[in-house]
Amino acid sequence: MSLEALDQLQEKVQKMLEANALLQMEIEEFKEKNIVLEEKINAISAQQKDLVDQNNELKQEKTVWQNRLNSLLGKMDDI
């Protein structure tokens, strides 16, 4: 191999190493963003669970109040 060919090969290898380093940095950034997104998903999932629980409690309270109201209306009809 000529010296010129070796220089070109060395330059290509250096460019590939630099590109590889940049890609590794991008991968690390994506991993960090992924962690943040997973934390947000977990927080939203917890909020959703709380809202579902609260909704179920409100539905139960509504049923209790409807039963009480129907009972009172039934007593009024008896009078």
UniProtKB/Swiss-Prot annotation:
Transmembrane segments: none annotated. Homodimer. The ends of the coiled-coil dimer bind to each other, forming polymers. Interacts with FtsZ. Disulfide bonds: none annotated. Non-essential, abundant cell division factor that is required for proper Z-ring formation. It is recruited early to the divisome by direct interaction with FtsZ, stimulating Z-ring assembly and thereby promoting cell division earlier in the cell cycle. Its recruitment to the Z-ring requires functional FtsA or ZipA. HAMAP family: ZapB (MF_01196). This is Cell division protein ZapB. It holds the Pfam family ZapB. Keywords: Cell cycle, Cell division, Coiled coil, Cytoplasm, Septation. It comes from Hamiltonella defensa subsp. Acyrthosiphon pisum (strain 5AT). It is found in: Cytoplasm.
